[in-house]
A protein has these predicted regions:
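Membrane-embedded multi-pass helical conduit in multi-pass membrane proteins
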Residues: 31-76, 423-531
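Loop-to-transmembrane boundary segments
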Residues: 8-28, 122-155, 186, 217, ...
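N-terminal membrane-anchoring/stem segments of glycan-assembly enzymes
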Residues: 1-131, 481, 507-513, 521-531
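Membrane-proximal soluble regions of multi-pass membrane proteins
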Residues: 373, 379, 383-384, 388, ...
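C-terminal catalytic/acceptor-binding lobe
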Residues: 352-432, 441-457, 514
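Internal catalytic domains of large membrane-associated glycosyltransferases
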Residues: 78-397
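Intrinsically disordered or highly flexible coil/loop and linker segments, enriched in small
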Residues: 168, 237, 273-274, 288-289, ...
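Hydrophobic alpha-helical transmembrane segments and immediately flanking/interface helices
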Residues: 165-172, 453-459, 530-545
Length: 545
């Protein structure tokens, strides 16, 4: 469906619907928060019953998510030592390769067996489908790295990691998408970097994004789109089919593992709908995790856990941060939105609408590493974390546009619209309200209890009920602590066992961080959207220590 994926410069009915749907998330969140506070004061017994019911629901959701977090982490760790390039080359001779796999006995530990069985099943399905697929020698990786104010020590390690991978660097085109407004020093840094690495790749060059193009916001999506359009011209000139190009838009601090692009190529080749799919790895924030304060580690690890959980249910998965997709699909949907802040999630919703709901995100059991938020001082770090989470929460700007598109699009099944719309709406509401319900509002009925309620059996039963619930919830906390330590990069000798113990103890900060550095920024973003006070793009400061 042809749909103008924007909330700007609308008129008539579209403008009214846009404002209605912009108001809905923020208004709902405020009604829930204020309504529960008022109810706790006016009728504490009713409020207590609602809170206990919410606690039970939260516990079930928490245990459910913890189970899938464990399963997803197990699968991720099972693929940690996989030779993805060997598998990719095997697909080029699929009949012979499948025969070899069928004759190969199951060996190794449980993780190796699971990895092997999953791989053999995928190859069997691919062979049975018999569909045409490109040879691995025909696959090209297009990597777009937007640069605004990041210095060489931020983006060069990521470029070096591209060159060191097992996927042939001579099948990679790397573009540094440089903002025209960048400082002279950064422009010089990008030129020096291109001169150093250009010969390592099929090609590498700089695309300068002009400042002040009409209709564009000062956002990463506008920069990436300008670079992608130049890439399209370049690929046509080189006679490289868009269907065989995998495009990746990476944050400037992204560092990939040696097997990353080999694994991406594998997931692309075995995907039956590769031209209608995005590919989402698990982001971890390990580049500077040893130097990050506890509040940052808790929040960034929580973001990684969320992606791990979502990867177990691809129907709920939405692109986030650094991700990849077929370049043909990117061209078909007319690239990233140029007037939106949340370009990483917006490109999924734009594709979902364009292809009438026939678009999916394929989870990759592979990681890529980025910087955790670290500033010169602890307080500046806190402020930067707040701004970053508010920017992430600004993804709520997708909701009104998606809802308008659902009303116009008759080809997307009604049930899929309802399910998808509810998932999107509920995700933003739970982001803002759950933390308040768990840490602040839950105490109010006892504080405002009148004589009738305070002398009831239920009043004396509540502490035991909530105590049992939170004791059961501690299983999830312990699991998070263990897995967070497992996700840490290898100790380079500078950090003692005491620091690892400190990393475990940091999870005691969860009640504070989820309220003030997660729920409050999200509520801030929703309130701004509700009031029509639209955000501008804020580039996270990158500080190397």
């Amino acid at each position: 469906m042809e749909f103008r994926f924007t909330g700007n410069k609308l008129t008539g009915k579209d403008a009214k619907l846009q404002r209605l749907f912009e108001i809905a998330p923020g208004a709902t969140s405020w009604i829930i928060i204020i309504g529960m506070i008022v109810l706790a004061f006016v009728h504490p017994l009713t409020a207590a019953v609602i809170i206990i019911a919410f606690y039970l629901y939260w516990l079930l959701r928490l245990l459910y998510m913890t189970l899938f977090l464990i399963l997803s982490y197990f699968r991720l760790s099972a693929e940690e030592n996989t030779n993805w390039m060997e598998r990719v080359r095997g697909l080029d001779r699929i009949e012979e390769y499948l025969d070899e796999l069928n004759k190969t006995p199951l060996e190794g530990d449980l993780k190796k067996r699971i990895s092997f069985l999953a791989h053999r099943k995928e190859v069997q399905k691919l062979a049975l489908a018999g569909a045409d697929r490109p040879s691995s020698n025909d696959i090209y990786q297009l990597v777009i790295i937007p640069v605004a104010k990041e210095t060489k020590d931020v983006f060069e390690p990521g470029i070096k990691s591209l060159e060191e991978g097992t996927f042939p660097a001579k099948q990679m085109v790397v573009i540094l998408a440089l903002e025209e407004r960048a400082s002279d020093q950064i422009k010089q840094d990008t030129e020096e970097t291109v001169n150093t690495y250009k010969d390592k790749f099929f090609d590498m060059f700089i695309v300068i994004h002009p400042d002040g193009i009409i209709g564009e916001a000062k956002a990463k999506g506008a920069n990436a789109t300008f670079a992608a359009k130049k890439a399209a011209e370049y690929l046509k000139e080189k006679k490289i089919p868009f269907e065989t190009v995998i495009s990746s838009c990476f944050d400037s601090d992204t560092i990939v593992t040696t097997q990353y692009f080999a694994s991406l190529t594998y997931y692309f080749l075995v995907c039956p709908y590769r031209q209608r799919a995005s590919f989402q790895p698990v982001p971890v924030y390990n580049n500077n995790i040893w130097d990050a304060p506890g509040i940052t580690r808790v929040l960034e690890t929580g973001s990684s856990f969320f992606q791990l959980i979502e990867s177990t249910n691809p129907e709920k998965l939405v692109t986030f941060s650094s991700h990849s997709m077929s370049f043909k699909a990117l061209v078909d949907v007319d690239y990233w939105p140029v007037d939106m802040i949340s370009d990483d999630s917006a490109i999924f919703w734009k594709s979902f609408i364009h292809f009438d709901g026939k678009y999916r995100v394929v989870p990759m059991y592979a990681t890529l590493s980025m910087d955790a938020v670290v500033a010169e001082t602890w307080w500046q770090t806190v402020k930067n974390v707040y701004k970053q989470k508010r920017r992430w929460a600004w993804g709520v700007e997708n909701f009104p546009i998606v809802m308008r598109a659902f009303l116009e699009n008759r080809k997307i099944p009604f049930f899929l619209k309802v399910k998808t719309g509810y998932k999107l709406f509920e995700g933003h509401i739970s982001w803002t309200t759950w933390a308040f319900m768990l840490t602040i509002i839950g105490w109010l009925p006892a504080i405002f209890a009148g004589r009738d309620y305070s002398q009831s059996v239920f009043y004396y039963s509540v502490p035991r009920i909530t105590g049992t619930i939170f004791h059961l919830a501690s299983f999830s906390l312990i699991t998070s602590i263990v897995l967070s330590l497992c996700l840490l990069p290898k100790n380079k000798g500078r950090h003692s066992i005491l620091k690892r113990i400190g990393f475990a103890m940091q999870w005691l900060l969860v009640p504070l961080t989820i309220v003030f550095l997660s729920a409050v920024p999200a509520l801030d973003a929703q309130t701004r959207l509700m009031l029509g006070k639209y955000m501008t793009f804020w580039v996270t400061d990158k500080v190397k220590k």
